[in-house]
Design a protein with these regions (language model features):
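Short, active-site-adjacent cap segments at secondary-structure transitions
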Residues: 12-14, 50-55, 103-104
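Loop/turn-to-beta-strand initiation segments
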Residues: 40-44, 120-123
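Short beta-strand segments
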Residues: 5-9, 44-48, 97, 126-128
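Short hydrophobic/aromatic-rich motifs at helix boundaries and adjacent loops
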Residues: 2-5, 54-56, 86
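Ligand-binding beta-strand-loop-alpha-helix segment within the catalytic cores
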Residues: 58-124
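N-terminal glycine-/serine-/threonine-rich phosphate-binding loop
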Residues: 1-42
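N-terminal active-site beta-alpha-beta segment that forms phosphate/nucleotide-binding
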Residues: 27, 35-36, 42-43, 49-56, ...
């Protein structure tokens, strides 16, 4: 079966306002992911974080760009935690990874571990 990388915009998770996480939108994405997963399609999902944090207004106020980027990375992790929880509640085995390890919360991304998870039929969620 083929493997696909799915990019979900953080703003899309926020619904019409593009802010926060709208449960119905998250459920819809889970429906689509579940349908593909049930067909045997291997999925890695990359999440944005624009629904929870946009750094442009802080950068305009003088915030260091790197700090803003780090805050955006944390926003993607929060979206990943939500998606991971919604998928698991449906019985879909998924594994959440972050470019920045957060021991006790999110495993640090490792290519081999993520690839093995996909080969084992898990949905891989990539954040950070």
């Amino acid at each position: 079966m083929p493997a696909f990388l799915l990019k979900l915009s953080g703003e899309a998770l926020g619904g019409e306002a593009g802010v926060g996480i709208e449960p119905e939108i998250l459920k819809h994405y889970c429906d689509e992911i579940e349908a593909a997963h049930r067909e045997g399609i291997k999925l890695a999902v990359v999440l944005g974080g624009g629904n929870l944090f946009r750094g442009a207004h802080l950068a305009a106020a003088g915030m260091d760009r790197v700090i803003g980027d780090r805050m955006g990375m944390l926003a993607t992790v929060m979206n990943g935690l939500a998606l991971n929880d919604f998928l698991r509640r449906r019985g879909i085995v998924s594994q959440l990874f972050s470019a920045v390890p957060m021991p006790g919360m999110v495993e640090g991304y490792n290519r081999d571990t993520a690839k093995a998870a996909m080969q084992n039929g898990e949905v891989v969620i990539l954040t950070g």
